[in-house]
Every structure is written in C-alpha cells, then in structure tokens.
C-alpha cells in the first residue's frame, strides 16, 4: 500500500472514530448514552463516572500520534506501515464496539473489545519504547 494512501486512511479512521464517539453521547446511538448502558449493567469493576474523563487525554494523545504519523517521512517510524494498519483496525474495532454496546449486543461487544485490546497490544509490541507512539498506546491500552 502506498504510504500516502495509508496516511489518508489513518487520518480518516481517526476522524470517524472521534465522530462516532461524539455521536454515541450527543445523539445517543440506539437511544441511550454509553454511560447509561454502563449504569444499566451493575458490575463490581465499573469505575466511577469521573474516571471516564481519561478519554479526553487518551484521544488527545491519539491525535498527537496521528499528526506524527501523517507528517512523518516514509520509514521515519519503526514498522510504520504495520502501525498504520493496526491503528486503522483499532479505530474500526472502537467503532464496532460502540455499535455493539449501544444496541445491547453485550456478547458481541465483549468479543470486539477483546480484539480491540489485542490490537492495542500488537501496536505496543511493534513500537519502540522511547517514542510518543509508545506513550500514546501505553496510556490507551491502560
């Protein structure tokens, strides 16, 4: 795949992921917000509502990654093509999880989340530990 095309796909994937996350709460998908669904299923490991504010920091770091990726010279980042493809997959899985979650497909949302976590772990595996990419996806992975 040509690197310029991959850069465009990375940028568009990020923008679509952010837009879908925005829609999930501003115009709730399936008529219910992400937080309302979380509250619907009382579990022992659901964090307090304020802890979800970490997503602002995560998405800011992901934006920095996207800017670095899109503006980098071809080959400037180790495993650049693979990282771009894995990032696009992570965006698709993020959107897929939102759709499953909002339409109350809990088993499907769990499976998508597992794939999402595997994808984030794969990104970390192919990233050098000293760069912004590693920091970004370390925070994203949790």
Model-derived features: positions:
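Hydrophobic alpha-helical transmembrane segments in multi-pass integral membrane proteins
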Residues: 48-68
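Alpha-helical transmembrane segments of multi-pass integral membrane proteins
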Residues: 12-19, 86-93, 97, 112-123, ...
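Structural signal for the C-terminal ends of transmembrane alpha-helices
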Residues: 67-74, 123-128
């Amino acid at each position: 795949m040509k690197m310029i095309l991959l850069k465009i796909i990375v940028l568009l994937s990020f923008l679509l992921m952010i837009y879908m996350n925005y829609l999930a709460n501003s115009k709730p998908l399936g008529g219910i917000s992400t937080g309302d669904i979380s509250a619907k299923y009382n579990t022992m490991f659901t964090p307090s509502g304020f802890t979800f504010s970490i997503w602002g920091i995560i998405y800011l770091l992901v934006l920095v990654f996207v800017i670095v990726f899109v503006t980098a010279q071809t080959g400037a980042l180790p495993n650049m093509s693979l990282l771009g493809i894995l990032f696009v997959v992570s965006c698709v899985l993020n959107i897929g999880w939102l759709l499953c979650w909002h339409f109350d497909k809990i088993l499907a949302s769990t499976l998508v989340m597992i794939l999402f976590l595997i994808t984030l772990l794969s990104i970390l595996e192919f990233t050098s530990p000293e760069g912004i990419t590693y920091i970004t996806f370390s925070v994203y992975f949790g």
